[in-house]
Amino acid sequence: CKECKTRYRADNLINDFTNSNLGDTLTNEERVSYIKDNKVPCPKCGKSNFTDIREFNLMFKTFQGVTEDSKSAVYLRPETAQGIFVNFMNVQRSMRLKVPFGIGQVGKSFRNEITPGNFIFRVREFEQMELEFFCKPGTELDWFKYYKDKCKDFLLSLGIKEENLRLRDHDKEELSFYSNATTDIEYKFPFGWGELWGIASRTNYDLSRHMEVSKEKLEYLDPDTNEKYVPYVIEPSLGVERLFLTVLCNAYTKETLTDGTTREVMKFTPALAPYKVTVLPLVKKFHSEKALELYKELSKHFMTMYDEGGNIGKRYRRSDVIGVPFAVTIDDETLNNQTVTVRDRDTMEQITLKVEELVDYINKKMEF
């Protein structure tokens, strides 16, 4: 922007302006024309006065050793995938694997983003989880559909609300040059729809290019048919930070209760909650000794909190706001007959259980 000197990606400007993925389908010339014709405003200053589009290297460049010349130039990896491709034959032979099979990796990636933002949604250094699934040519679209469904089911198992998820297939103009099919799983963040998980059919482009440059054979010999081929690849790629952000946004809830008060609560699915249970003595003076005893026992099985300060209602709220699924209250009944009150975070309903039943009860609720 010439007015406020803020840099933006042209495709993101158009996407945000239209609340669609139109910017991804246009050429640079078409993007410039669209921005001018529609007077797309700068998100910061509101003016529509932009420079022409400039090419921008998304890879971080540095130098290895003490000299800074072209021979010592190196780049931080923008994805983890290529390390898997160059090790394809090594893994296949050492593990004696038959196609189809997959190789997964978790690691740091680096991208020189023009406009990082929206908390941890777009950052320059991030943790990436990628799977390269190698399959026989001709079967890749069946596996592509399989992983689309598998990835969505995984997100639903984390408690992500289905109404905030959508699968968006890339059209031909938007497809990367190496792909014959790509789908983004998008989540409806507070700032709008954003890509969470990309599933791409990368054909055999990567292995073929590594073969071409390295002169090493990366072909697979099918032991059943004696057929030799370069496998096709299905790649589900997920950023850990974006998944964390999705889980946080999905869990945050602000509720108005029947008495007119409001409460803020993180409704994590119990398996994902950082703390599983909080132990609360009803009256510190009379119940804290028994409560501490129970706290130590539960801590052997779960991440457990202990809170004895303030009235019980405020302690429930403190537990709710950090997403603890279960609050166990120790009272006179505990001292007399070894029963406790267990409060559910989401429904606020309470039940009475024997102390010896607690671990099994919580474990069952946390089944994933």
Outline where the language-model segments fall.
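NTP/phosphate- and nucleic-acid-binding module
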Residues: K2-F368
